[in-house]
From Swiss-Prot:
PANTHER family: REGUCALCIN. It comes from Oryctolagus cuniculus (Rabbit). The keyword Cytoplasm applies. Pathway: Cofactor biosynthesis; L-ascorbate biosynthesis via UDP-alpha-D-glucuronate pathway; L-ascorbate from UDP-alpha-D-glucuronate: step 3/4. This is Regucalcin. Binds 1 divalent metal cation per subunit. Most active with Zn(2+) and Mn(2+) ions. The physiological cofactor is most likely Ca(2+) or Mg(2+). Keywords: Ascorbate biosynthesis, Calcium, Cytoplasm, Hydrolase, Metal-binding. Monomer. GO terms for cellular component: cytoplasm; nucleus.
Length: 299
């Protein structure tokens, strides 16, 4: 196996960087800074960063088949245009919960945009419990609510055969699986496939590789872990020089590089001096596995 190399490729100083997505068409990495209310597109070749500031926390971003992007902003599913900096609301959720916001989101293989909510935090990972729900924005802009009683709706992805939906509610310290019906978007038969170890801390963002194994970013754990969803075993741990790793995706040529986002918020001055790259974008090469291209929202 080739040697693993970890480097901070963009010192962005995100309060809480999240939702990395590779955009093959532009050879760029998309990501957000949730408290910074920013959506960013970074081109590793030219080093150019395009930024777009919102009026509410922007928590996830995804590609859109018809062009531009979709994002979760506050409690709204929105369409974004980076060129003219426009934001168009497509749907709103949790109207009865004024203290809620979206968190992580991702598009399924049929082009539906799944995203979940949570209560606003009073400090990182400190919040009113059981206030969140999981939703999906269908291509016709209708919203389906799947379940509620969620603490921090987080990482999500689908198995390579599209028959299993993987999902993380962070404060359950578990990676869960559901049976998935791609035709209808229905989920059923929830079960836990991996419980995090104490030193792994809080499960956050997640992605899948071409071997069907899951990669989970561990918030406060300073690592990404590779899991076998069939055996429930951890296969690999890759530690980063920052504590608050938040999410991960594959990208670059052939999707052979992993990009990892992280946070600065919640670190005291002493911790920040020890990890000056906190809030940056990290690239991991030499993992010996590849990812799959992200799906695009079909609406």
């Amino acid at each position: 196996m080739s040697s693993i190399k970890i480097e901070c490729v963009l010192p962005e100083n995100c309060h809480c960087g999240e939702s990395p997505v590779w955009e093959e068409a532009s050879g760029s990495l998309l990501f957000v800074d949730i408290p910074g209310k920013k959506f960013c597109r970074w081109n590793p070749l030219t080093k150019a960063v395009q930024r777009m500031t919102m009026d509410a926390p922007v928590t996830s971003v995804a590609l859109r088949k018809s062009g531009g992007y979709v994002a979760t902003v506050g409690t709204k599913f929105c369409a974004l245009n980076l060129e003219d900096q426009s934001v168009v609301a497509l749907a709103t959720v949790d109207k009865d919960k004024k203290n809620n916001r979206f968190n992580d989101g991702k598009v399924d293989p049929a082009g539906r945009y799944f995203a979940g909510t949570m209560a606003e935090e009073t400090a990182p990972a400190v919040l009113e419990r059981h206030q969140g729900s999981l939703y999906a924005l269908f291509p016709d802009h209708q919203v389906k609510k799947y379940f509620d009683q969620v603490d921090i709706s987080n990482g999500l992805d689908w198995s390579l055969d599209h028959k299993i939906f993987y999902y993380i509610d962070s404060l359950a310290y578990s990676v869960d699986a559901f049976d998935y019906d791609l035709q209808t978007g229905q989920i059923s038969n929830r079960r836990s496939i991996y419980k995090l170890e104490k030193e792994e801390q809080i499960p956050d963002g997640m992605c899948i590789d071409t071997e069907g194994k899951l990669w989970v970013a561990c918030y406060n754990g300073g690592r990404v872990i590779r899991l076998d969803p069939e055996t429930g075993k951890r296969l690999q741990t890759v530690k980063l020089p920052v504590d608050k790793t938040t999410s991960c995706c594959f990208g670059g040529k052939d999707y052979s590089e992993m990009y990892v986002t992280c946070a600065r918020d919640g670190l005291d001055p002493d911790s920040l001096s020890r990890q000056p790259e906190a809030g940056g974008i990290f690239k991991i090469t030499g993992l010996g596995v590849k990812g799959i291209p992200p799906y695009s929202y079909a609406g």
